[in-house]
Amino acid sequence: MDIMRSVVGMVVLLAIAFLLSVNKKSISLRTVGAALLLQIAIGGIMLYFPPGKWAVEQAALGVHKVMSYSDAGSAFIFGSLVGPKMDVLFDGAGFIFAFRVLPAIIFVTALISLLYYIGVMGLLIRILGSIFQKALNISKIESFVAVTTIFLGQNEIPAIVKPFIDRMNRNELFTAICSGMASIAGSMMIGYAGMGVPIDYLLAASLMAIPGGILFARILSPATEPSQVTFENLSFSETPPKSFIEAAASGAMTGLKIAAGVATVVMAFVAIIALINGIIGGIGGWFGFANASLESIFGYVLAPLAWIMGVDWSDANLAGSLIGQKLAINEFVAYLSFSPYLQTGGTLEVKTIAIISFALCGFANFGSIGVVVGAFSAISPKRAPEIAQLGLRALAAATLSNLMSATIAGFFIGLA
């Protein structure tokens, strides 16, 4: 029954996308079918197929090892505030977001910058981009951007496409925006992992977002024009560093900006949510609903969607609440709310944890529309009106991509 519910959930998400399509007759079954099969195949290999699961587990161990090196840098600055004694002192509640998550973002951003400098990232992106281009029958610029989102966030994507943006057709531009919103950056992945989200789920979700973003981009806005973008030399930075030290330093400074942005937004939004909950609770108290909150409203509204995706009805309220927080605020705040359920152990089923982890894994939220429109408009002012028109539809496509990955994850974990 649960397996069939997951299948129905996939069909429902595809049906929603079809209803939102701007040109239903031009939908390419070749591209859409291949993207869906590839998204399912990646999920099956990484979550169900034993050799694939083993590979993901080893990769997760590697990420944990990388995080331990990040702790060395944090300990040098903050001392015992990042050590195990904090958990003893505070009876298991010694996790401090500012000292554990934010330094990891800085470290990993610097590491990624180094890997770009020595050519590892460029080689990997070229190989994967070529595979996805041929498998999905998409343009080179679309595959290039989609694969790059594994490592870079939506803030960096505009800089990558800057040399080509004036030659990109409307569909390619839409796909680029969708890919950025549907994905997470490598540096942010470490941040989520620092809050207890299983790394193997984050790795799988990151890869599944590549075909997932293209799948829903091509349903909501089918390709109707041939690509005009041709290039030989792919550039990953507008001003590439000239030395190993410069690469590390510039990456660290970029990481600092990201960490500062994350800290500022999370601090502000957590406070705003508390204020909104106080208002809702006060008004609700007049009618006998003193415990009403923004989270409970999201939970009631989105619980049916969470259930059709495969979450048990007993947990659907929680899942719906977290999905709502992610959409209305951002994924970091949603993961922060999810974190206590990951620390307690045994309160949620493995399948539920997986579905929620995948559903929250992406930049798709209303705030991202402003980020994307502002960033893309800055590099191509003449296309600003067109970019603004694509924002809300791109958010819908990216959200559906995240929910599809979550539904597929629930399907395969239900089989295990």
Swiss-Prot record:
Pfam families in alphabetical order: Gate, Nucleos_tra2_C, Nucleos_tra2_N
Main localization (coarse): membrane
A GO MF term: nucleoside transmembrane transporter activity
All ranges on the Periplasmic side of the membrane: 1-2, 53-104, 194-196, 290-352, 416
Cytoplasmic compartment segments: 24-31, 126-172, 218-268, 374-394
Membrane-topology descriptor: Multi-pass membrane protein
Keyword Ribonucleoprotein: no
Transmembrane segments: 3-23, 32-52, 105-125, 173-193, 197-217, 269-289, 353-373, 395-415
GO biological processes: nucleoside transmembrane transport
Keyword terms of this UniProt record: Cell inner membrane, Cell membrane, Membrane, Transmembrane, Transmembrane helix, Transport
GO terms under cellular component: plasma membrane
InterPro entries linked: C_nuclsd_transpt, C_nuclsd_transpt_met_bac, CNT_C_dom, CNT_N_dom, Gate_dom
Subcellular location: Cell inner membrane
Sequence similarity: Belongs to the concentrative nucleoside transporter (CNT) (TC 2.A.41) family.
Function, in words: Could be involved in pseudouridine transport.
PANTHER family linked to this entry: SODIUM/NUCLEOSIDE COTRANSPORTER, SOLUTE CARRIER FAMILY 28 MEMBER 3
Protein known as: Putative pseudouridine transporter
The species this protein was found in: Escherichia coli (strain K12)
